[in-house]
């Protein structure tokens, strides 16, 4: 299974037209992905047959949330589930880097009440012990976990990924992501035994109104912003 990490309505339509079957829908990919717009989800579900898993993440940085942030996370999950989301992508950690078991169990139960998929995101890669964390997620009833093996890229984390899959691959679906592309996907799948991959296939688009002689809204070099590179998508779909 290939899941594409998508940050816009336009990119969702384009990857669907290329033959993609599943996406993780976000906004603000430059921040690691935040909750998407409800209107984007509704249009995608109306106009494509994509399986759409929606991120619920209210802010940048880490995953130790206040009670106010948790209220918003659950409110957003409800809105997405009521409007066609096939799964919810979330992550709750305690201050010490362990899984926030209570919030995770509550979210899994809520998602499963809609008979949808509960997916723990790369907050997993910030946990203090990946094997203990995986056991906790299994005990909480999580269906799938996205991970790079606690390294910046899956290639760097391949030994951890292999170990996790050998120990837990029959109990929870492991989705391998971060830096996975057409050039390394086959090798990584063979080495780790993980057959499910997650990729953003990022490219850069230019917006000439980003910068003037006096004002700049640039956050990348020049006037660019993240968008999917469709050639990379095609290559990965052909692996």
Feature-to-residue mapping (PLM):
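Glycine/small-residue-rich loop that forms an oxyanion/phosphate-binding "nest" at active or ligand-binding sites
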Residues: 39-44, 50-104
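Hydrophobic faces of well-ordered beta-strands that scaffold small-molecule active sites
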Residues: 2-6, 23-25, 52-56, 88-90, ...
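Catalytic cores of alpha/beta
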Residues: 7-14, 64-76, 125-140, 164, ...
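Glycine-enriched alpha-helix->loop->beta-strand junction motifs that scaffold or abut catalytic
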Residues: 18-23, 48-50, 84-87, 113-115, ...
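C-terminal alpha-helical cap/extension of soluble enzyme domains
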Residues: 168-239
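Active-site-adjacent beta->alpha loops and helix N-cap segments on the catalytic face
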Residues: 10, 29-48, 68, 94-111, ...
């Amino acid at each position: 299974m290939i899941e594409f990490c998508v940050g816009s309505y336009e990119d969702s339509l384009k990857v669907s037209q290329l033959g993609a079957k599943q996406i993780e829908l976000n906004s603000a990919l430059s921040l690691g992905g935040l909750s998407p717009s409800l209107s984007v989800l509704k249009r995608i579900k109306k106009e494509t047959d994509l399986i759409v898993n929606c991120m619920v993440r209210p802010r940048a940085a880490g995953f130790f949330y206040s009670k106010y942030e948790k209220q918003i996370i659950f409110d957003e999950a409800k809105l997405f589930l009521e409007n066609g989301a096939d799964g919810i992508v979330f992550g709750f950690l305690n201050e010490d880097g362990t899984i926030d078991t209570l919030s995770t169990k509550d979210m899994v139960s809520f998602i499963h009440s809609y008979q949808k998929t509960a997916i723990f995101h790369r907050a997993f890669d910030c946990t203090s012990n990946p094997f203990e964390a995986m056991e906790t997620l299994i005990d909480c009833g999580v269906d799938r976990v996205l991970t790079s093996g606690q390294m910046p890229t899956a290639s760097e984390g391949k030994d951890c990924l292999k170990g996790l899959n050998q120990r837990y691959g029959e109990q929870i679906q492991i989705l391998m992501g971060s830096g996975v592309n057409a050039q390394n996907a086959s090798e990584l799948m063979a080495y780790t035994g993980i057959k499910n991959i997650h990729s953003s296939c990022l490219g850069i688009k230019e917006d000439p109104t980003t910068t003037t002689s006096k004002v700049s809204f640039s956050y990348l070099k020049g006037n660019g912003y993240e968008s999917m590179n469709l050639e990379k998508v095609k290559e990965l779909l052909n692996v």
